[in-house]
């Protein structure tokens, strides 16, 4: 209405201005005509009249010019005002049109979810289902695992710092279109020179052990021109001649029993069988109890039912263990402090990195491995001496007697390695994500202690390359993962987890901030039974991925079906045997380990760290068509994609805390028994139990339920005008993911475990006395084992604080 009134007022003023202009412009012309007519009429004028007339004319002209300038200014102002008014109207019109268009779009535009928006804004239009389908199809249509296994095995010398396997891995990544990054480290490591064992009778050599496997028919790996004798990485150089004693598995309990039975074990060569505990701890225990050196052999008795004693033929004619089998190993104490023993707690990043003395992290006595066949004549001479120890033995004519040997029966042992600083290289491929945090890391080592290594190193490396190939197909379809993904080929793992430990120590701050999960491939294919060790947080995503993975190409039989049929889909505890050690126990990054391994009752016996771990053995007794490799590549890749492609971290905190709660209940009863009259200990233990119970039965359930609701919100399609709801969901999403990533890190302690400061995870660690199994609540357990009241109180206080922080985090 006001605009109409202003318009009318403007038109009225405009009309008045025009009238004035017409009048003023007409007067000069009329006066001029009148003056001309008078002059013509009179016919003549006087000079005075002319002068007067000129003066009047000048005055009139000046007056008319002043009027003309004023009128021009008014007209100009009017035009400017008119132009301004037109622009204002135009802007109003534009604004109104824009609002109308936005309203139309808001009313009729397709609904979108927060999940889809993440991808649209980053030009990634593949849905989760399409991502899974493309990845699985790429691996189902082609399986290159056999090619990779043979390529790696063909180099026949894939130890630490091997250049051939490094170059092959690097070239494969480059051919797929990746830009791999090479990280070099410089650890202190040994190169085997010679090992020798010879039994002596009255000072004379009875025979010299071969210290190497037989050349067998049909297996090219055993006929390689360059073959390495059995050795122990990080064993002490030296030669020893002494009497010997059989010490069963070499555990602390075995040695306590030997001392209880008054067996003389001082300054003897201790012969122990492999199994039960890590080789390094066997040598460590032997050194502690006065051994001069150690021999470790593999007893077929520990192979279960598949033995020659039970009628099975040995390899290559049957599934039983070949009697000439020798297991090479590392004997550094990596269940205490993994990695380079001369750079504990920091990476050997440069060639001039300071290296400390390895004392306390490696043995100070020599040790060597032997075959069952070579050790048999030595053990046989112990019969009737000492007492019988252990569960039994399949060493021919040996009754498991401890000895020691007679004064005329001795063994000469020689061990020699050359120790130097060597360059090692890990190869890393990064796939950037839409999010900058929440990395999923997949790792596999390519080194081994024996040539070939088809089941151990080469299978894991082949599967890693197949996963990379499947993801390269996705990248060609314009895929960009929500979370970043890394694939890493480790070096030096079999020597003592060198590559992964150096990497974790070098990138500790970044990994704590960004890493979400570490997935490990080690000894990936050595049998047909699927086995999984994992942090309980990952249970749900592992089960879901297994259900969506076809087992060996069978559409109606999933990996989960096979897993449940063979072992009831059991997820075991992590131990201290592989590359996940640094991630889980040092940094608090949830980890999982996957493998197909042998069945003790019917499966072929696996020849670990031996020349018999060859493609021939693999194809003959385990995986002739390499479909297990294909199944594993699909499963691990699918697990990675499920973690990466979901906006919400796929962690189940209730399952996680329920496991911890059950663990603690077991230790709580032990605490009451160990300190029955100690009110302070029992009161503190009860407070921890009550706090953990509330966190498990209330906080974790509520947190998981809220995450379930949030998951649906992220997938809910909303109109454009409801963008504020997406903003609220996004804020909640960021907060939830941050909490999920922090939960495991809350159990990282600065002090670490007693005498194992590098192990900082208070919920789980490799067993201090076995190493090959995981130990729950290790600080509390070790304090209880030593009946150390101060240590128990310290760990109860730590757990009380940590569980309080968990409750606060989940609320």
Curated annotation (Swiss-Prot):
InterPro entries: PA_dom_sf, Peptidase_M28, Peptidase_M28B, TFR-like_dimer_dom, TFR-like_dimer_dom_sf. Residues 336-345 have a biased composition (Low complexity). Zn(2+) 2 binds at residues 445, 456, 522. Zn(2+) 1 binds at residues 456, 607. Binds 2 Zn(2+) ions per subunit. Glycans are attached at residues 55, 237, 568, 599, 670. Residues 1-63, 334-367 are annotated as: Disordered. It comes from the Eukaryota. Its cofactor is Zn(2+). Its main location: membrane. Its EC number is 3.4.-.-. GO terms for molecular function: aminopeptidase activity; carboxypeptidase activity; metal ion binding; metallopeptidase activity. One of its GO terms (biological process) is protein targeting to vacuole. The keyword Secreted does not apply. The keyword Zinc applies. It is found in: Membrane. The chain crosses the membrane at residues 90-110. It is a single-pass membrane protein. Gene3D superfamilies: 3.50.30.30, Transferrin receptor-like, dimerisation domain, Zn peptidases. GO terms for cellular component: endoplasmic reticulum; membrane. Belongs to the peptidase M28 family. M28B subfamily. Involved in vacuolar protein sorting. Present with 112 molecules/cell in log phase SD medium. This is Vacuolar protein sorting-associated protein 70. It comes from Saccharomyces cerevisiae (strain ATCC 204508 / S288c) (Baker's yeast). The gene is VPS70.
């Amino acid at each position: 209405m006001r605009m109409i009134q202003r318009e009318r007022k403007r038109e009225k003023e405009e009309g008045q201005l025009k009238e004035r202009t017409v009048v003023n412009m007409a007067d000069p012309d009329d006066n001029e005509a009148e003056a001309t007519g008078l002059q013509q009429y009179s016919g003549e004028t006087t000079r005075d009249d002319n002068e007067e007339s000129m003066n009047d004319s000048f005055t009139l002209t000046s007056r008319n010019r002043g009027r003309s300038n004023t009128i021009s200014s008014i007209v100009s102002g009017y035009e400017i005002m008119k132009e301004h008014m037109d622009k204002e109207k135009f802007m109003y019109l534009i604004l109104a049109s824009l609002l109308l268009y936005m309203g139309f779009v808001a009313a009729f535009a397709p609904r979108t979810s927060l999940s889809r928006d993440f991808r649209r804004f980053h030009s990634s239009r593949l849905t989760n289902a399409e991502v899974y389908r493309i990845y699985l199809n790429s691996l189902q249509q082609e399986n290159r695992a056999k090619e990779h296994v043979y390529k790696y095995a063909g180099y026949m010398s894939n130890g630490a710092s091997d250049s051939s396997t490094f170059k092959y891995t690097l070239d494969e990544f480059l051919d797929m279109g990746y830009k791999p990054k090479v990280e070099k480290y410089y650890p202190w490591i040994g190169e085997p020179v010679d090992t020798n064992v010879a039994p002596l009778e009255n000072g004379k050599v009875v025979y010299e052990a071969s210290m190497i496997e037989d050349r067998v028919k049909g297996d090219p790996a055993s006929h390689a021109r360059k073959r390495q004798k059995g050795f122990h990485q990080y064993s002490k150089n030296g030669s020893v001649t002494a009497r010997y004693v059989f010490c069963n598995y070499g555990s602390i309990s075995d040695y306590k029993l030997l001392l209880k039975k008054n067996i003389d074990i001082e300054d003897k060569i201790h012969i122990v069988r492999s199994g039960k505990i890590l080789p390094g701890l066997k040598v460590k225990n032997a050194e502690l109890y006065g051994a001069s050196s150690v021999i470790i052999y593999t007893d077929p008795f520990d192979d279960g039912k598949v033995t020659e004693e039970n009628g099975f033929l040995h390899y290559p004619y049957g599934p039983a263990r070949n009697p000439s089998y020798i297991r090479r190993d590392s004997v550094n104490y990596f269940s205490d402090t993994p990695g380079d023993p001369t750079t504990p707690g920091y990476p050997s990043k440069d060639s001039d990195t300071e290296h400390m003395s390895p004392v306390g992290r490696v043995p100070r006595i020599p040790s060597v491995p032997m075959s069952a066949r070579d050790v048999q004549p030595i053990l046989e001479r112990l019969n009737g001496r000492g007492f019988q120890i252990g569960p039994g033995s399949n060493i021919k004519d040996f009754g498991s007697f401890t000895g020691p040997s007679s004064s005329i029966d001795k063994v000469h042992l020689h061990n020699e390695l050359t120790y130097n600083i060597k360059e090692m290289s890990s190869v890393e491929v990064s796939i950037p994500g839409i999010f900058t945090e929440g990395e999923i890391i997949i790792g596999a080592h390519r080194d081994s202690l024996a040539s070939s290594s088809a089941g151990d190193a080469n299978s894991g490396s082949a599967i890693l390359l197949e996963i990379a190939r499947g993801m390269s197909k996705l990248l060609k379809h314009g895929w960009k993962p929500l979370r970043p993904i890394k694939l890493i080929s480790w070096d030096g793992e079999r020597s003592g987890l060198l590559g992964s430990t150096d990497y974790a120590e070098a990138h500790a701050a970044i990994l704590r901030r960004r890493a979400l999960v570490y997935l490990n491939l080690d000894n990936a294919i050595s049998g047909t039974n699927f086995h999984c060790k994992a942090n309980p947080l990952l249970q749900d995503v592992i089960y879901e991925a297994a259900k969506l993975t076809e087992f060996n190409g069978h559409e109606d039989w999933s990996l989960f079906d096979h897993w449940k049929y063979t072992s009831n889909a059991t997820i075991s505890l992590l131990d201290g045997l592989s590359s996940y050690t640094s991630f889980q126990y040092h940094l608090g990054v949830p980890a999982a380990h996957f493998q197909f391994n042998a069945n003790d009752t019917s499966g072929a016996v696996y020849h670990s760290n031996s020349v018999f771990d060859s493609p021939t053995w693999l194809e003959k007794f385990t995986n002739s068509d390499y479909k297990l490799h294909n199944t594993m590549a699909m499963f691990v890749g699918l697990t990675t994609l499920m973690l990466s492609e979901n906006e919400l971290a796929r962690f189940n905190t209730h399952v996680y805390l329920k496991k911890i709660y059950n663990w603690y209940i077991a230790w709580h009863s032990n605490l009451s028994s160990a300190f029955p009259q100690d009110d302070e200990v029992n009161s503190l233990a009860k407070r921890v139990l009550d706090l953990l119970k509330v966190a498990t039965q209330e906080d974790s359930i509520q947190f998981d339920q809220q995450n379930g609701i949030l998951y649906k919100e992220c997938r809910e399609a909303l109109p454009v005008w409801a963008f504020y709801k997406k903003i609220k969901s996004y804020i909640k999403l960021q907060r939830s993911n941050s909490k999920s990533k922090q939960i495991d890190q809350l159990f990282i302690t600065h002090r670490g475990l007693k005498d194992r400061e590098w192990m900082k995870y208070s919920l789980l660690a490799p067993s201090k006395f076995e190493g090959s199994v995981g130990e729950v609540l290790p600080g509390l357990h070790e304090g209880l084992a030593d009946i150390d009241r101060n240590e128990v109180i310290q760990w109860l206080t730590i757990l009380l604080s940590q569980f309080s922080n968990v409750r606060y985090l989940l609320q």
